């Protein structure tokens, strides 16, 4: 075989490997254990719900939207708050913010004080959120951990919640794809490859691009923090009225 052919084959192998390492959802048919739907946790819920993601809390930066979140939760009579991953910017930040013993600051940061609300947490990207193995060192209260993926049963509708890092392991690539090429196409692809029924909704984070696709029943919460020159903060969430079966993008004023 000619050296040029070997070089081309080598380049193709490297390209395919890098593609699969970033877009890991395409490994699900080969490695089913990677598919978070295999061990999805079912949770019964009732009432209006707010989904937010990608707050990327940092120990050296005060979160500016506590009052805005509290106002939305209170004014819309939200029963459930679901944080769809990447609550922290890094496990180190998580330890510095909520790693001390005693009362967790999470309720204060998220504006939950004085509200009759259930709060839940979906595991985000490993470079950002602490793993479930670190439960003993990071006090997530009052957030209830639901693992890497959850099925929320509202009776009127089913909502799958997954952060979305298998759509694109490098968040910047996923952001650029959704922003410049085809919005919510990664979300639609993940839903199909993961085997989620067409009738179910899926709520994501990760790309920092808010959006709702009613036809395919996928939605993204959007992000809260700027990342270098590319990622701009949307400061949005998704409000769900299960009685109406509808999602709405809500924006938070500082």
Language model feature labels by segment:
Residues 1-48, 246, 251-254:
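Acidic, histidine-bearing metal-coordination/catalytic regions of metal-dependent phosphoesterases
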Residues 10, 36-46, 52, 57-154:
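Core catalytic region of metal-dependent phosphoesterases/phosphodiesterases
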Residues 30-38, 63-66, 182-192:
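Short, motif-level signal for alpha-helix interfacial/capping segments enriched in acidic residues
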Residues 47-49, 80, 157-159, 201, ...:
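Structural motif
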Residues 48-56, 157-170, 218-223:
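Active-site-proximal beta-strand elements of phosphoester/diester hydrolases
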Residues 56-60, 88-92, 122-133, 167-170, ...:
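Active-site environment of divalent metal-dependent phosphoester hydrolases
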Residues 137-148, 176-254:
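Conserved beta-sheet core of the metallophosphoesterase superfamily
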Residues 153-156, 215:
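Short strand-coil-strand connectors
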């Amino acid at each position: 075989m000619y050296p040029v052919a070997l070089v081309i084959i080598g380049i193709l192998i490297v390209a395919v490997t890098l593609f699969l390492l970033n877009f890991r959802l395409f490994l699900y048919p080969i490695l089913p254990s990677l598919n978070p739907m295999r061990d999805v946790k079912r949770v019964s819920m009732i009432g209006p719900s707010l989904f937010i993601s990608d707050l990327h809390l940092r120990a050296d930066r005060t979160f500016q939207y506590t009052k805005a979140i509290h106002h939305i939760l209170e004014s819309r009579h939200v029963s459930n708050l679901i944080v769809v991953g990447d609550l922290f910017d890094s496990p180190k930040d998580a330890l510095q913010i909520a790693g001390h013993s005693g009362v967790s600051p999470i309720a204060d940061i998220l504006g939950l004080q004085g509200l009759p609300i259930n709060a839940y947490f979906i595991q985000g990207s490993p470079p950002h959120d602490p793993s479930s193995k670190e439960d003993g060192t990071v006090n997530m209260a009052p957030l209830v951990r639901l693992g890497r993926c959850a099925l929320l049963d509202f009776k009127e509708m089913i909502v799958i919640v997954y952060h979305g890092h298998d759509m694109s392991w490098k968040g910047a690539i996923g952001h650029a794809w959704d922003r410049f090429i085809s919005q919510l196409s990664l979300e639609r692809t993940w839903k199909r490859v993961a085997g989620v029924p067409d009738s179910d909704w899926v709520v994501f984070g990760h790309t920092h691009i808010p959006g709702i696709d009613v036809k395919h029943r996928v939605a993204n919460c959007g992000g809260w923090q700027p990342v270098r020159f590319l990622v701009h903060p949307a400061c949005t969430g998704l409000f769900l009225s299960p009685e109406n079966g509808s999602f709405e993008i809500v924006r938070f004023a500082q």
